[in-house]
Amino acid sequence: MTNLKAVIPVAGLGMHMLPATKAIPKEMLPIVDKPMIQYIVDEIVAAGIKEILLVTHASKNAVENHFDTSYELESLLEQRVKRQLLAEVQSICPPGVTIMNVRQGEPLGLGHSILCARPAIGDNPFVVVLPDVVIDDASADPLRYNLAAMIARFNETGRSQVLAKRMPGDLSEYSVIQTKEPLDREGKVSRIVEFIEKPDQPQTLDSDIMAVGRYVLSADIWPELERTQPGAWGRIQLTDAIAELAKKQSVDAMLMTGDSYDCGKKMGYMQAFVKYGLRNLKEGAKFRKGIEKLLSE
């Protein structure tokens, strides 16, 4: 079994969520009572990963601080006998989990962001989890499905894995996947035959499958990333490097189990907030009544 490190690229500017993200990192926008990035880290830890690398930017100090120990806050909560809150704060970075930071000096794309993590990862396989996409942990057990299943399959086959989902409609802003066999049920795996970042003419592709922002990558991706030239939007794209790797060896796409929300965009963020708000143990029932009242007006 391979001990994998996870990379979370958090250096993006969050332009789809402006003006909220002008001074606040999009990864720190709350979904009820936890910032978006916390859901991502919880998913990674549930999949069995103990070392996490945040690729950050000078404007993202709040993300780094979130995972640092706040001795003053913990002391205050202890003095005031706020044991539940203290436990929640201390669980932000669970025992045995290490969260490190590296900087991406220039916004040159997701592929470049991953390359910034190479000195900390070495010539080893690794995991990439995009912080925009939150997978609903109530719709799929993170101990068994999606990222956990991808890691298990990678350990079994040695092949790189890409999580995918069906997305009927306009795919021009997504990474579109074509597979050898149809992905017609949750958890099904098929070899990737084409992988295109933000296609100019998505209607010409016989596919409604997009990448979900979860990757388990073999060490063979490093040379491909080094050779990748700027692509869509003038950025070095991880998708382009994976597409080149798929020409040389099998790369699998796995159809996601459960539901996900693109929280890097307003609609996905609002949907996630409502979904998590409705099942919040403390306030969910009141929240539901409030929404029902608003809808009835």
UniProtKB/Swiss-Prot annotation:
Disulfide bonds: none
Matches recorded under Pfam families: NTP_transferase
Gene3D superfamilies for the chain: Spore Coat Polysaccharide Biosynthesis Protein SpsA, Chain A
Domain of life: Bacteria
Catalytic reactions of this protein: alpha-D-glucose 1-phosphate + UTP + H(+) = UDP-alpha-D-glucose + diphosphate
Enzyme class: transferase
Keyword field contains Nucleotide-binding: no
A GO molecular-function descriptor: UTP:glucose-1-phosphate uridylyltransferase activity
CDD domains with a match to the protein in the record: UGPase_prokaryotic
Keywords: Lipopolysaccharide biosynthesis, Nucleotidyltransferase, Transferase
Record bears the keyword Plastid: no
Pathway per the UniProt entry: Carbohydrate metabolism; nucleotide-sugar metabolism; Bacterial outer membrane biogenesis; lipopolysaccharide biosynthesis
Enzyme Commission no: 2.7.7.9
Designated name of the protein: UTP--glucose-1-phosphate uridylyltransferase
Source organism of the structure: Escherichia coli (strain K12)
